[in-house]
C-alpha cells in the first residue's frame, strides 16, 4: 500500500539496537525489484504448499516521485502488471489531478480496480475518459461489472473482495465533478448483505480509509473477515530494533475483523498466512511485515559517508538476524523493465544541478519549538517569482505545507531531488482575485484544519503576506495583524475590502482542507501553465543559492484553544 511510485530503492534512516549501543545509519531499502523478488518467493512457496496467494494493493500507487511526474501512471501500470496484482483499491492520490490519469491507467492494467462506493453513473456517454463501462472498474452499479466485488477461491471456498475509498474524496483530492462518493458505512453494509445473499461468508475489504477508520469500521460493521488497508502509512509490527515507530501489532482484531497495513513507499511488504474459519472468520497462522533490503545494499552513516568494513559486517549480521528484515536479491526482470523503459529517461534530472545550499533547509508542516518550515515559504516565493516573470501581476502567495515532502540537505541540489522528492505532486498553479476578508478567513480555516482537525498539511506558508494567529479568539477573528508587501518591498496594512490577486496551487484554490473561503473568488481562476516543481526549479536556478526566508511571516499565539 501507498507505494507512491517509489520504484527504486530508498536510503532509509535507521537506529539499530546493537549490543554495544545504538547505531544510526542509512540503509538502502525497498523498491520494486526487491518487492518482485519477495513476491516471487512467496508464490513459489504457495505453489509448493498448494495454497492460493492473493496479492492486494491498498491504493496510492500514484504521485511521489519523478516516475509519476514524467510518465503519468504508465510506469505504475506496467510495474504493477509485472508484479501480478490481483486487485487494487483507488487511493486519494490516484485522483489528485482529476479522473483522466486513472482512466488511462485503467486502460493499461490487467487487474481489477476496486471502489465500491464510487458512483460513476453521471459520466457522459461520450466522455473520453469514461470509466463507468470498463469491465475492470469494480465500482457502484457499473453495468460492465454488475457486482461491486470480485470473488477468489480457496480450494472450493469462495472469498469476496470489495474496495472502499474515502467518502470525502472531493475535499482532499480533485476528482471530476461527475464523480459521487457514497457513505462508507452504509455502502459496506449494503455490499456485505449482497455478498451473504450470494452465499459467500468470507469477505476481504481492500480499503484506502486509513488505519483509525479501518478499526472504527470493523467495529461498526459486522461481517468483514479481513481488512487490508492503506492511506495512513501505518507500519504494523515490532520494528523497534531498527528504530522505526512501533505503531500497532500486526493483524490486530476488532469485532472479529483482522486489520492489516504494510507501511509505505515500497519499503515494506506484508505477508499473512490465513486460515478460513466457520461463520466467515479468518485467523492469521503466521506472517507479518518485513523491511526489504539486500546483503549488498548500500550502508552509510546518517551523513551519507561510507562505514568502515568491520562495522558494516557487524550491521549486516545484525540485520540478517532480524525476523522483520528480508535480505533479497533484486528481481532481474523487474530491474530490466525499470532500466530499459523508464529509468534512463529520468537520468538527466539527476545530473541537472539546480542550486546550492550553504546550510540545510528544514521542512515541518506545523511550526514547532524550532520554528516553521524553511522550505515552504520559498515555494510560495517561487510561485510569486514565476508569475511575475510571466507578466502576471500577483500580490500574495500561499503554499500549503503538505505540498512539500522533505527537508533539503546542504550542498548541491538536483532537479531530480526537487521535482522527484521535495515537490513530487504534479500540482498546477492558479491565480485569481479574492476579497481581503475572504483571504483572512481562508488562512484561519487552514490553520484550524491543521491544528485542531488533524489536517497538518493545510498549514499556510505565505509570501509577501504576514499574519498572526490567536487560538483563544472566537472563530472568525483568529487571524489578525495582516500586512502585504508592496512592489517596493515595504509592508502595508492589509485591507479587508480590497481585492488581492492570490497565487496558489490549484488544489488549494478548490477550497480543500480548510481553504473553503477561497471559493468566494472575485475572478475566475487562471492556470499559470506549469506545475509547482517547475516553478520552484526556475526560481531556485535564478537565485543560485537558497537560504531561509528573512521575514517573519507568521506568529502563532496559544493562550488556550477555543472551539
Residue ranges and their predicted role:
Residues 1-293, 375-382, 397-399, 433, ...:
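Acidic, metal/ion-coordinating pockets
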Residues 4, 10-23, 353-367, 425, ...:
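Acidic/histidine-rich, surface-exposed loop or edge segments in extracytoplasmic proteins
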Residues 6, 12, 112, 121-122, ...:
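Feature captures C-terminal
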Residues 32, 73, 99, 312, ...:
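Alpha-helix initiation and N-capping motif
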Residues 37, 41-44, 104, 190, ...:
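Charged/polar, solvent-exposed surface patches and flexible loops
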Residues 158, 364-365, 491-493:
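Short, solvent-exposed loop/turn motifs
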Residues 272-409, 510-512, 540-563:
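A short C-terminal boundary segment appended to hydrolase-like catalytic domains
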